[in-house]
From Swiss-Prot:
Name of this protein: Glutamate--tRNA ligase
Keyword Lyase in annotation: no
Coiled coil: none
EC number: 6.1.1.17
Length: 489
């Protein structure tokens, strides 16, 4: 790259970190680090009606949780601050004054009702609604009259005539807009706060932003920002617009979509690992060379190539996310898996927060049984249900297993073996399977399936000898005895 790469993620503190925003931040982070550049966080907080208390802190908290580290930002400072737009209002005023001096900005006193009436008339005439320029050249007398009426003006940018705005999008290639597509647009609202496109262009220039990677919904904002760059004689950054994220039904991912969790906080609370989320999100609209999908952050930084950003919409595949998180759980230290899962058993009321050491060790052993199956921490509650239920029931498939003619003999012999065990541990229990097989002559599914169903109520499950040990001698013998009595054995 001919100049230092400087990219920014610019969240608005309007709520929690959304999947789409997390992807924008992550791609900018990978882009910056791949090219040994700088990753900047700039808070765009001028819309006080939409700002949420704690919104900025929440965004930064979950960016950090994902593993992103920034080089400049409101929380750590930097050479090109301040990094909150509400702290830069004097800067915007300075450049607004310059636009007035160049006759590139003017006051517009039209009310919202007047503007809507104008748009409606254009629609009725088959035109695309845009500002007509009605207040483009007001006389001093007209301005005085509007001021006397108490009207508050907005300030509009005077869009140049017969001008073409072209940029080579990093994702989509050449994109062109004509100035005639736009009416004079508002750069400062009636409350004196600069609009998004005006403030962003100034910030991007002053912060020396080299590249802007963002969602495709910003494509139409790009020519407006280019107008501001042109007005001051500045070089615009390179732009790249990522495709939409769709749900599994190929519809745009919406915050109102109840079938997909939308916020990073929700995934953390459910027991997803941050490195799994980082890996998964990195593949939403970008693909590496080859078939491999599992990458560390360091590997992604090394291989990230903006030319491989997809021109097709990304699909948020929940099954793939669960698969990927499971892969990370299987590779994690057991202590970390326990820390991930145990709080969910406590939250569900299965265990007490002040459990004794013996109970905690038992719970850790139970969790270890499901390490290979666990897709996210909260799933441990469902997976381990058999260890917390007092009574077990049998579905039709299980009943069919128990109806086998060999079952009473298998269960009776196995029960007798367990009764006489001195040490009720998995190794000793495992040996009783072999002893039961030797005594009854039954092997394979005819031996193991009846014992599994009788002791756990399930057709499938974790390592059976260890599960039997953890369920405990009393529970297991009671279950076997009850079932044998029902069979008349």
């Amino acid at each position: 790259m001919s100049k230092e790469v400087r990219v920014r993620y610019a969240p608005s503190p309007t709520g929690h970190l959304h999947i789409g925003n997390a992807r924008t931040a992550l791609f900018n982070y990978l882009y910056a680090k791949h090219f040994d550049g700088k990753f900047i966080i700039r808070t765009e907080d001028t819309d006080d009606k939409r700002n949420v208390e704690g919104g900025e802190e929440s965004q930064l908290k979950y960016l950090k949780w994902l593993g992103l580290q920034w080089d400049e930002g409101a929380d750590i400072g930097g050479e090109y601050g301040p990094y909150r737009q509400t702290e830069r209002l004097d800067i915007y005023q300075e450049y607004l004054n310059e636009l007035f001096a160049k006759n590139l900005a003017y006051k517009c006193y039209m009310t919202e009702d007047e503007l809507e009436a104008e748009r409606e008339e254009q629609r009725q005439n088959g035109q695309v609604p845009k500002y007509s320029g009605a207040h483009r050249d007001l006389t001093p007398e007209q301005i005085e009259q509007f001021e006397a009426e108490g009207r508050q003006p907005s300030i509009r940018f005077r869009v140049p005539e017969n001008t073409t705005y072209t940029f080579n999008d990093l994702v989509r290639g050449k994109i062109t807009f004509e100035s005639s597509d736009f009416g004079d647009w508002v750069i400062v609202k009636k409350n004196g706060i600069p609009t998004y496109n005006f403030a962003v262009a100034i910030d991007d220039h002053l912060m020396k932003i080299s590249d802007v990677l963002r969602g495709e919904e910003h494509i139409s904002n790009t020519p407006k920002q280019m107008m501001i760059f042109d007005a001051f004689g500045w070089e615009a950054p390179r732009y790249g617009h990522m495709t939409l994220i769709l749900n599994e039904e190929r519809k745009k991912l919406s915050k109102r979509d109840e079938h997909i969790l939308q916020f990073i906080e929700q995934y953390r609370n459910l027991g997803y690992l941050p490195e799994a989320m980082f890996n998964f999100i990195s593949l939403l609209g970008w693909s590496p060379v080859g078939e491999e999908e599992m990458f560390t952050q360091a590997q992604l930084i090394e291989i990230f190539d903006p030319e491989r950003l997809s021109t097709s919409a990304a699909i948020f595949d929940q099954h793939k996310l669960k698969w990927m998180n499971n892969e990370y759980i299987k590779a994690a230290d057991l202590d970390r898996v326990i820390d991930l899962a145990l709080p969910h058993l406590i939250k569900a009321g299965k265990l007490s927060e002040d459990m004794d050491d013996e109970t905690r060790q038992w719970a850790e052993n139970v969790i270890s049984l499901y390490r290979e199956q666990l897709r996210y921490g909260a799933e441990i509650v469902e997976l381990t249900e058999l260890f917390f239920q007092k009574e077990i029931s049998y579905d039709e498939e299980a009943k069919e297993v128990l109806n086998g003619e060999q079952v009473p003999e298998v269960l009776q012999v196995f029960t007798d073996k367990l009764i006489h065990l001195e040490s009720f541990d998995k190794d000793a229990i495992k040996a009783q399977f072999k002893a039961t097989q030797k005594e009854t002559g039954h092997r394979g599914k005819k031996l193991f399936m009846p014992i599994r169903v009788a002791t756990t109520g399930q057709m499938h499950g974790p390592e059976l000898p260890f599960a039997i040990e953890l369920l405990g001698r009393d529970i297991i013998l009671n279950r076997l005895d009850k079932l044998l009595k029902e069979m008349g054995a």
